[in-house]
Curated annotation (Swiss-Prot):
Residues 786-795 have a biased composition (Basic and acidic residues). This is Protein tiptop. SMART domains: ZnF_C2H2. Residues 159-175 have a biased composition (Acidic residues). It comes from Drosophila melanogaster. Pfam families: zf-C2H2 (PF00096), zf-C2H2_2 (PF12756), zf-C2H2_6 (PF13912). The tsh tio gene pair seems to have arisen from a recent duplication event: tsh has the dominant role compared to tio. The keyword Transcription regulation applies. Keywords: Activator, Developmental protein, DNA-binding, Metal-binding, Nucleus, Repeat, Repressor, Transcription, Transcription regulation, Zinc, Zinc-finger. GO terms for biological process: compound eye development; epidermis morphogenesis; Malpighian tubule stellate cell differentiation; negative regulation of transcription by RNA polymerase II; regulation of transcription by RNA polymerase II; specification of segmental identity, head.
């Protein structure tokens, strides 16, 4: 049997190859098969063939159960691809009718014995058996052969004609949608006639393929069954399949499109509508007919593969999107192209959108030249319409159709179920669009520049809520922003988020521009609601929300940045310097003491300049400041170098002392360049040309100074307790010395006392107490100190610069003049070896009272003097032990000796005092002569001096400016006189011997405060 069977099969094969039943006949039979499956057993052209085909369609499941997957692959190809695999057996039976019964028996036995499992023609044999049975039933065993042979040419001619028509239609499909409709109708067998026949049966056919598609759930790599096809089947496919695929593809695509429309939720609805509208007959009848044909084929295919139990058979040609199964790769390709189920959209510019369905390029592995052409033709019209739903459709496709779906075990989970995770990860934070790959998201970001908008979650939320409203406003609002006008409106939000003024939401191209804007508009402040509100109104609610957040952020701007902004602003005008004040008291107004008018805080300084600038001799004071401040660099520095720092500190202080600030501004403002700084210093120190704010400032700071002075006094007391005691002994000398000086300049002293009120007493005690140890007498004698200081300073000012004295005489200028005179004293007295300031700083009450009378006309002057001599006092305490050494050191400072000398002196004094137990009685601890900071080693102390007190020692004023510490090294003798009585004698006659008596109490409190001031200045200057 096996031999006979093999011979018969070989004969059949030869007959098939020779007769070329392949394309035309196969198509006709396929059409007959589909017709037989859908319509009935009768065929108008070839009933016998039809009966055979129908029998094959229906019996193939029974006959094929024994077939192996290979055979199955062959037979399905014949059935599904309209290949003549089924027909070759039928043709053979027709050619060999007498042997059909024997063949049937052989085939039955072979199938039962599974002998034909490996035979690629087993399907043909089974089909031959069924065909012979059907032929016998019809009663004409030979008639099928005769009819078949006769009708083969007819059907062949018909098929050729049909194929020609189909080819024409395919060309027309590429050019016209009508032809596409016909093409859709055309092929189950890839023949138009069969498609037309199937149109009537289309509705049930649609249902059938759907059920079949439901059966086919998981897609397998397409073309897996194609390789087993025999050469003759390949030829058949090449001949008929190429033509029929494209024809069949549109119909299948239409059907799949309808299914996709149902299953793609909202994304494919427009696509389905277009497909149905473009092909009404196709959508309603043709796709149905095609589906019926495919349904017949699917039935044979499905039964064949499912009966074989091949799990992979279900997934051979299955749309992963709509789960619809297809008999051929061409059908699936066409379906995916037309329905865009491949997940790719291509804007094919073909003139004819054959099918109004959104077209997407089929996967490369599924794409064929014909399918590509069809896809391009159909995509032209539908690409624009489908753009709206492309993103959502793509998302669904990404979820449902990872290609390939099953490459390795578990990969389907990653590609399918894990798609959601991937979409969440590869998601545009701006528009929320998800992407299947990083490359897609990258291209999206590049095209839309949405990456510029990824700033913060809160901003993302606000932008999402008001995206549409916000974009136009963003572009419009940031007129100066370079990025805002960029084509993608999204750039403006990103720029505004990064380089945007938090007050007015104006975007800037660079940080420098933003800083300039903030400094000029004072938008670095939190409160400028007026400036912020108009832009906010323009931008809309979302922007207002962002504005609020921006205000919060601007609140958190670093002090350094604020100081920088203030400094930059102060260079142009004081408005920027007053920005914090304006913020603090935007609604408050300060009454000008000169004109009595109420002026806004931000504008008060300028007003003061105008009102007081003329009346107050600014140049003399400035010149004095130049001369006097050099001796007392703290003032000079405050006036010149640290304007931004001082302004920043001023503003901070002024905010807390608004009213005082205004007054301070009044007097401080008149010194145009240096005065604001000096005024700010006076304000901080509580020294005001107008005593009103001097007292409050001093009161506020007085407590702090007193505390620091007491603490430092305690610290320095140990260091300079002996020196202070010596000072106390020298205090009378100082007091006397002070009177001696006061006679030298009797005129100036009277004005300072009026200038200095009881408030100055309080303030002065702070300063004086710090300097003098905060003794009660000192506090009480602050007024006298001012007088005495005026007298004492007047000699200095006379020697240094008479202008300061003249200025001091006026009550308003008295404080400033006193300060200048103090600076003069610091420089002049120290240079001349005067220890008057030291007397003022003496901790002893008598010294305090005398020092109060001394040239410390103002707390600020005393403070600056202390700053200059604060460190020396501690050294003075140390040097107080030896008046001669103090005197020598005093001589060095008075001579404005090199910083190096002062530095060496400070180091030596600290070491000596430590060795003498002056530093808290512990010889192992070295205390800074300037700030009383304890150090365990000389190296640490030297480092401290170099980093803190001698940073600006390069200039004579710089040490002083740096801090009393700086000058104190120079005026260490002076400082020591302060702390030591030597200074008080020096005050009287500028006697170096008394200078040895140092009042460490004076230095330590004063030095603390001064150091604090210096550090603040340095910090602000660095920041600024």
């Amino acid at each position: 049997m096996m031999l006979h069977e093999a011979v018969m099969l070989e004969i059949y094969r030869q007959a098939l190859s020779a007769s070329e039943l392949t394309s035309p006949r196969c198509q006709s039979r396929d059409s007959n098969t589909s017709a037989g499956a859908g319509a009935g057993m009768a065929d108008v052209r070839c009933p016998s063939n039809e009966s055979h085909c129908s029998a094959n369609d229906r019996l193939t499941p029974a006959a094929t159960p024994t077939l192996t997957p290979t055979e199955a692959t062959i037979s399905p190809n014949s059935v599904g691809l309209p290949l003549t695999a089924t027909l070759p057996p039928a043709a053979a039976v027709a050619l060999l009718p007498p042997q059909s019964a024997a063949m049937a028996a052989y085939l039955a036995a072979a199938q039962q014995n599974h002998l034909l499992l490996t035979n690629p023609l087993a399907a043909a044999a089974s089909l031959v058996q069924h065909a012979t049975q059907q032929a016998v039933v019809e009663g004409e065993v030979e008639s099928p052969a005769l009819d078949f042979s006769r009708k083969r040419p007819k059907s062949h001619g018909d098929d050729d004609q049909e194929e020609d028509q189909e080819q024409d239609q395919e060309q027309e499909q590429e050019q016209e949608p009508d032809h596409d409709v016909q093409c859709d109708n055309g092929p189950l067998d890839l023949s138009v006639s069969t498609g037309k026949r199937q149109e009537s049966v289309s509705p049930p056919a649609r249902k059938i393929p759907r059920s079949i598609s439901a059966d086919y759930k998981s897609p397998l790599p397409p073309g897996s069954w194609m390789p087993p096809i025999n050469p003759y089947l390949a030829a058949v496919a090449a001949k008929t399949g190429g033509l029929g695929y494209s024809k069949l593809a549109p119909s299948e695509a239409s059907k799949a499109l309808e299914k996709m429309t149902e299953m793609s939720r909202l994304e494919t609805s427009p696509t389905a509508a277009r497909s149905l509208g473009a092909t009404s007959s196709v959508g309603a009848g043709v796709p149905a007919g095609a589906s019926s044909n495919s349904g017949g084929r699917h039935s044979a295919w499905q039964s064949h593969w499912l009966n074989k139990g091949a799990d992979t058979a279900k997934d051979v040609f299955k749309c992963v999107w709509c789960k619809q199964s297809f008999s051929t790769l061409a059908n699936l390709t066409a379906h995916m192209k037309e329905t865009q189920h491949c997940g790719v959209q291509i804007p094919s510019p073909l003139p004819t959108g054959g099918v109004g369905t959104p077209s997407a390029p089929p996967p490369t592995r599924l794409a064929t030249s014909a399918s590509n052409s069809a896809c391009s033709s159909s995509s032209s019209s539908t690409s624009s319409s489908s753009n709206s739903s492309k993103s959502e459709l793509n998302m669904l496709i990404k979820e449902t159709m990872p290609l390939p779906r099953k490459l390795v075990r578990g990969q389907d989970v990653w590609l399918g179920k894990g798609a959601e995770q991937t979409r969440q990860i590869l998601k545009c934070m701006w528009c929320g669009q998800s992407f299947r790959s990083l490359a897609e998201m990258t291209s999206h970001m590049q095209e839309t520049q949405h990456y510029t908008n990824i700033i913060s979650q809160e901003q993302i939320i606000s932008w999402k809520s008001g995206d549409e409203r916000e974009r136009p406003t963003n572009t419009g609002v940031p007129s100066t922003s370079t990025a805002a006008p960029s084509s993608p409106s999204c750039t403006a939000p990103s720029v505004s988020a990064v380089l945007t003024c938090k007050v007015c939401d104006q975007a800037f191209g660079s940080l420098k521009e933003l800083s300039t804007h903030m400094a000029q508009k004072s938008h670095y402040k939190e409160s400028p609601a007026p400036s912020a509100s108009p832009p906010a109104a323009g931008t809309g609610n979302p922007k207002r929300g962002r504005q609020n957040r921006n205000e919060k952020r601007k609140k958190s701007l670093p002090v350094r940045k604020l100081l920088e902004l203030e400094r930059s602003g102060s260079n142009s005008s004081l408005d920027s310097a007053l920005k914090p004040l304006r913020d603090f008291a935007a609604a408050t107004k300060i009454t000008c003491e000169k004109c009595g008018s109420k002026i806004e805080t931000a504008l008060f300084v300028e007003h003061i300049r105008k009102c007081l600038g003329e009346s107050i001799p600014i140049p003399p004071r400035r010149s004095n400041a130049g001369v006097d401040r050099l001796p007392s660099p703290s003032l000079g520095l405050g006036a010149e170098k640290p304007p931004s720092v001082l302004n920043a500190l001023e503003q901070l202080i002024e905010k807390s002392f608004e009213s005082r600030t205004s007054r301070t501004m009044t007097h401080g403002g008149y010194s145009e360049a240096g005065t604001p700084l000096g005024a700010s210093i006076l304000k901080r120190l509580g020294i005001e040309d107008s005593s009103d704010y001097t007292k409050p400032l001093m009161d506020a700071q007085a407590m702090h100074l007193l505390r620091s002075s007491f603490a430092s006094r305690d610290r320095s007391a140990s260091e300079s307790s002996s020196a202070s005691r010596v000072e106390s002994s020298y205090t009378p000398d100082r007091q006397q010395a002070t009177p001696h000086k006061s006679p030298d300049t009797p005129a100036p002293p009277p004005p300072p006392p009026p200038t200095i009120k009881a408030e100055p007493l309080e303030a002065e005690p702070l300063v004086g107490c710090d300097r003098e140890g905060c003794s009660p007498r000192q506090q009480i004698q602050v007024k006298k100190e001012f007088s005495m200081e005026a007298c004492r300073e007047s000699p200095r000012s006379v020697s240094k610069s008479p202008a300061p004295q003249t200025e001091r005489s006026p009550p308003d200028n008295g404080s400033l003049l006193a300060l200048n005179s103090m600076f003069d004293q610091l420089s002049g007295v120290e240079n001349s070896g005067n220890n008057n300031s030291g007397h003022c700083f003496n901790n002893n009450n008598s010294c305090s009272s005398v020092s109060a009378q001394k040239p410390k006309a103002h707390p600020l002057a005393a403070l600056q003097k202390l700053c200059e001599t604060t460190d020396p006092p501690s050294t003075g305490l140390r040097s107080a032990s030896s008046a001669g050494s103090s005197t020598a050191s005093a001589t060095l400072p008075s001579a404005n000796g090199n910083d190096l000398v002062a530095f060496s002196w400070a180091c030596n004094e600290a070491v000596l005092s430590a060795s003498n137990g002056g530093s808290a009685g512990d010889s192992s601890i070295i205390k800074c002569s300037y700030c009383d900071t304890p150090f365990a080693s000389k190296g640490a102390y030297r480092h401290h001096l170099s980093k803190v007190h001698f940073v600006k020692d390069a200039g004579e004023d710089s040490p002083r400016l740096k801090s009393p510490a700086v000058q104190s090294p120079r005026s260490m003798p002076l400082a020591s006189p302060r702390r030591s009585a030597s200074r008080s004698p020096a005050t009287g006659s500028q006697q170096p011997p008394p200078s040895p008596t140092i009042s460490p109490y004076d230095e330590s409190p004063q030095s603390k405060f001064l150091k604090y001031t210096e550090l603040a200045k340095q910090l602000s200057s660095k920041n600024a």
